[in-house]
């Protein structure tokens, strides 16, 4: 369970970068986008340059003018280059130009069961296959080297949301405890989580049996309503439209699969109308939230 919390803390940034909106995959298709890019804040080290301020600004302007690619965004697998008119354009990255992996944790597994040294190597390779049938079918399945993922049994599927709900609640509480000046949560979110944090009946984080998790959900149902809505809002970013595509699910799904083999099947069953998107009511219903308690105003 602690490992679960670690992963979502790494993914809790609001900017879950995904360059395009894609529907949920069919049962044989998996996530294309993965790990989100957390927005970089201001440099905490502020250097006073005094009379050199103007010169520094001029130098910065010159650098920007000489490098049109500096603020030109390219999606995963592509890099910026200048054309004959000195205009920025995105081209496929050479996989051999990707940084050498530091360790096993950087490796990723594709849906054709091939391990890539890093997500950079995967997306660069996929880009070179753009326009081909193979490239269209190639997707990133999960984070980590390829391994055997056992099928998800019906009995196991019913247990998945029990752990997931408890995890979401614990992640929010952890973010609240660590927030202070880190801006991990908005003020509105803090007010909601504060009530959960101060509730004496709250089940502390731990590796609890599913029977205990089920009883706690029944007894302390109200504690779980906001965490489920909060996670939906964290994922619904590209665009913010009240629906989750498989691209938007990727930052949550990809790290979970090696630990929770029912992840893919769970998200597939959430799509009740099979339109390849998960709406808020479908998402909340998957976690046992009652229809009368589903409120888009809680997605804050």
Swiss-Prot record:
Top-rank taxon: Eukaryota
UniProt-annotated glycosylation sites, renumbered to this chain: 113
Name listed for the protein in its UniProt record: SPARC
Signal peptide annotation: 1-17
Compartment(s) where it occurs, according to its Swiss-Prot or TrEMBL record: Secreted, Extracellular space, Extracellular matrix, Basement membrane
Kazal-like domain ranges (all copies): 86-148
Disulfide bonds: 69-80, 74-90, 92-127, 98-120, 109-146, 152-262, 270-286
Gene for this chain: SPARC
GO molecular function: calcium ion binding; collagen binding; extracellular matrix binding
Cell membrane as UniProt keyword: no
Organism: Sus scrofa
């Amino acid at each position: 369970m602690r490992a679960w919390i670690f992963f979502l803390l790494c993914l809790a940034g609001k900017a879950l970068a995904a360059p395009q909106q894609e529907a949920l995959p069919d049962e044989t298709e998996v996530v294309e986008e993965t790990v989100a890019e957390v927005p970089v804040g201001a440099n905490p080290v502020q250097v006073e340059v005094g009379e050199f301020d103007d010169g520094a600004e001029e130098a910065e302007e010159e650098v920007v003018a000489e490098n049109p690619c500096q603020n030109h965004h390219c999606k995963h697998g592509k890099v910026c280059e200048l054309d004959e008119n000195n205009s920025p354009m995105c081209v496929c990255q050479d996989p051999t130009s990707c940084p050498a992996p530091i360790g096993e944790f950087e490796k990723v597994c594709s849906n054709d069961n091939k391990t890539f040294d890093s997500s950079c190597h995967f997306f660069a390779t996929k880009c070179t296959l753009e326009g081909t049938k193979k490239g269209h079918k190639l997707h990133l399945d999960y984070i980590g080297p390829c391994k055997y993922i056992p099928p998800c049994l019906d009995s196991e599927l019913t247990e998945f949301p029990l752990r997931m709900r408890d995890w979401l609640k614990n992640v929010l509480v952890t973010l609240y405890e660590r927030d202070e000046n880190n801006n991990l949560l908005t003020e509105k979110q803090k007010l909601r989580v504060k009530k959960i944090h101060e509730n004496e009946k709250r089940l502390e984080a731990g590796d609890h049996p599913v029977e205990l998790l089920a009883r706690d959900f029944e007894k302390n149902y109200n504690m779980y309503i906001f965490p489920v809505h909060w996670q939906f809002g964290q994922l619904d970013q590209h665009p913010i439209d009240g629906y989750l595509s498989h691209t938007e699910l990727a930052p949550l799904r990809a790290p979970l699969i090696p630990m929770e083999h029912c992840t893919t099947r769970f998200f597939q069953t959430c799509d009740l109308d099979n339109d390849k998107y998960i709406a808020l009511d479908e998402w909340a219903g998957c976690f046992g939230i009652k229809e009368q308690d589903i409120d888009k105003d809680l997605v804050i």
